[in-house]
Curated annotation (Swiss-Prot):
The gene is SMG9. The lineage of its organism: Eukaryota, Metazoa, Chordata, Craniata, Vertebrata. GO terms for biological process: brain development; eye development; heart development; in utero embryonic development; negative regulation of apoptotic process; nuclear-transcribed mRNA catabolic process, nonsense-mediated decay. Gene3D superfamilies: P-loop containing nucleotide triphosphate hydrolases. Keywords: Acetylation, Intellectual disability, Nonsense-mediated mRNA decay, Phosphoprotein. This is Nonsense-mediated mRNA decay factor SMG9. It is linked to Heart and brain malformation syndrome: An autosomal recessive syndrome characterized by multiple congenital anomalies such as cardiac defects, brain malformations, including cerebellar vermis hypoplasia, hypoplastic corpus callosum and Dandy-Walker malformation, profoundly delayed psychomotor development, microphthalmia, and facial dysmorphism. Neurodevelopmental disorder with intention tremor, pyramidal signs, dyspraxia, and ocular anomalies: An autosomal recessive disorder characterized by characterized by mild to moderate intellectual disability, dysmorphic facial features, intention tremor, dyspraxia, and vertical strabismus. It comes from Homo sapiens. Involved in nonsense-mediated decay (NMD) of mRNAs containing premature stop codons. Is recruited by release factors to stalled ribosomes together with SMG1 and SMG8 (forming the SMG1C protein kinase complex) and, in the SMG1C complex, is required for the efficient association between SMG1 and SMG8. Plays a role in brain, heart, and eye development. GO terms for cellular component: cytosol.
């Protein structure tokens, strides 16, 4: 500044003047006033300092609002970006695992929970898109156990890859047996081939047969199971005794034969009890006996007792076939077999301890006496009453169910007899000769002096036809009650394993061993 008070151009530039003029409120500034120049000179520096401090303070204060003010500005200018922020979906996965765990227990509801978890109104649509597939997966979850069960039953293939033909084959009935197979061979060993024909169902009836040699056990079992009298005996499921075998005096069946029908009825045909042909085979062929038996006839009797005791334990019905009335040794044998019969296995838990005496829990089958090859006079009512009375007296002390389950009077075999004709009716059934049908169909012709009318009448038989009696016997046997063999309900396969265990126990029975020592 010069002495005259004029400002030098170098010191006061255009910017200085602008900076001095800018803060003014308006109008020219008075520079000639007292103290005006000091204000003009000092105030600008202070103003610069103040401006610098204000600029720094405003810059610091403006940085934070600028950063915070940018998102609202962008949100106002660009509405689509609300969906763009990827930061909000980040917490969503943290909540989704919690939401996904709940539908597994509650079933439905993942869509509603995800919709409620979104705070904004526009946000639910985006998560709603992935929610449906998750809901579908959760909806399929309850059906997974069904597919697992099908996989176990149908194989290892996936449910979608299952062949419908295979599933339909499972519903078909089992293969029909065409002939009997061995359950116990001639060496008295158990055979496991019969289990292939058994199912896992409990509605099964087991019928066994006992009888002396040549009484027609195999023929009766074949007629009851699958064959008819008109068929050739060589095609029977249980092979009957051939003419050559009859001439030699031998037995056709050895061990125990097994056959099951489509109606799930098991038939067990056995070798003859107390058979002389088996005894002759042991003696003449020098067959070695087990060490516990010293004499051949003792071994034959023990074999017969083992088979009878086995049938009394695993059968619902046991048919005793005889071809004449009657053999007292047969009834003595039945009482002995009942004595050595193995007891019913007790349950694992002692819940049946309050059932009463041991006789109440012990199992005994139905016993049917079948008089095969009956003659005409055997069908006489007076003779019929005598037979019933004698059997009742011989079996009076037996626990076997030998009465009250089969009746010839109720099936109309004797239409003229009242139901109370027999005082004590036992399970007795009469079947005539099978060959008598051919004789009755071809009666002898009348002589030349007789009336031709008699030649047209059928011959008198004195009893119903063979086919009719076999049909009545079959219907009564198959309609018998099926008591529980053990303390638990057995399926067909369970019965097979139960029978195998019983047979092993019979072979090792201490009661039979003690009885064999008494016979020796």
């Amino acid at each position: 500044m010069s002495e005259s008070g004029h400002s030098q151009p170098g010191l006061y530039g255009i910017e200085r003047r602008r900076r001095w003029k800018e803060p003014g409120s308006g109008g020219p500034q008075n520079l000639s006033g007292p103290g005006g120049r000091e204000r003009d000179y000092i105030a600008p520096w202070e103003r610069e300092r103040r401006d610098a401090s204000e600029e720094t303070s405003t810059s610091v204060m403006q940085k934070t609002p600028i950063i915070l003010s940018k998102p609202p500005a962008e949100r106002s200018k660009q509405p689509p970006p609300p969906t763009a922020p990827a930061a909000p979906p980040a917490p969503a996965p943290l909540e989704k695992p919690i939401v996904l765990m709940k539908p597994r227990e509650e079933g439905k509801g993942p869509v509603a929970v995800t919709g409620a978890s979104t705070p904004e109104g526009t946000a639910p649509p985006p998560p709603a898109a992935p929610a449906p597939p998750k809901g579908e997966k959760e909806g399929q979850r309850p059906t997974q156990p069904v597919y697992q069960i099908q996989n176990r039953g149908m194989g290892t293939a996936a449910p979608a890859a299952m062949d419908p033909v295979v599933g339909q084959a499972k519903l078909l009935p089992p293969e029909r047996m065409k002939h009997s197979i061995k359950l116990v061979d001639d060496q008295m060993n158990w055979c496991d081939s019969a289990i292939e024909y058994l199912l896992d169902q409990t509605d099964v009836l087991v019928v066994g047969v006992l009888g002396l040699q040549g009484t027609g056990k195999s023929m009766v079992m074949s007629l009851l199971s699958a064959n008819t009298p008109e068929e050739d005996q060589r095609t029977y499921v249980f092979r009957a005794q051939s003419a050559e075998m009859k001439e030699r005096g031998g037995n056709q069946t050895s061990g125990i034969d097994f056959f099951i029908t489509q109606e799930r009825i098991v038939f067990l045909d056995t070798q003859p009890i107390l058979s002389p042909s088996i005894l002759d085979h042991l003696i003449n062929n020098d067959r070695k006996l087990p060490p516990e038996y010293n004499l051949p006839h003792t071994y034959v009797e023990m074999q017969s007792l083992q088979i009878a005791a086995f049938l009394f334990t695993v059968c619902h019905v046991v048919i005793v076939v005889q071809d004449w009335f009657t053999d007292l040794s047969l009834y003595r044998f039945l009482q002995t077999a009942e004595m050595v019969k193995p007891s019913t296995p007790s349950p694992s838990h002692e819940s049946s301890s309050s059932s009463g005496s041991d006789e109440g829990t012990e199992y005994y089958p139905h016993l049917v006496f079948l008089q095969n090859k009956a003659r005409r006079e055997d069908f006489c009512p007076r003779k019929l009453r005598q037979m019933h009375l004698m059997i009742d007296q011989l079996m009076a002390h037996s626990h076997l169910r030998y009465k009250g389950t089969l009746s010839m009077l109720q099936c109309n075999v004797f239409p003229g007899l009242p139901p109370d004709f027999l005082d004590s009716e036992v399970n007795l059934f009469l079947v005539p000769f099978m060959d008598s049908e051919a004789e009755s169909e071809n009666p002898p012709r009348a002589g030349p002096g007789s009336s031709p009318l008699f030649s047209l009448l059928p011959g008198y038989r004195g009893h119903p036809s063979f086919q009719s009696l076999v049909s009545k016997l079959r219907s009564q046997v198959m309609s018998m009650a099926r008591p529980q063999l053990s303390h638990t309900i057995l399926t067909e396969k369970n019965w097979f394993h139960y029978a195998a265990r019983i047979w092993d126990g019979v072979r090792k029975s201490s009661a039979l061993a003690e009885y064999s020592r008494l016979l020796a």
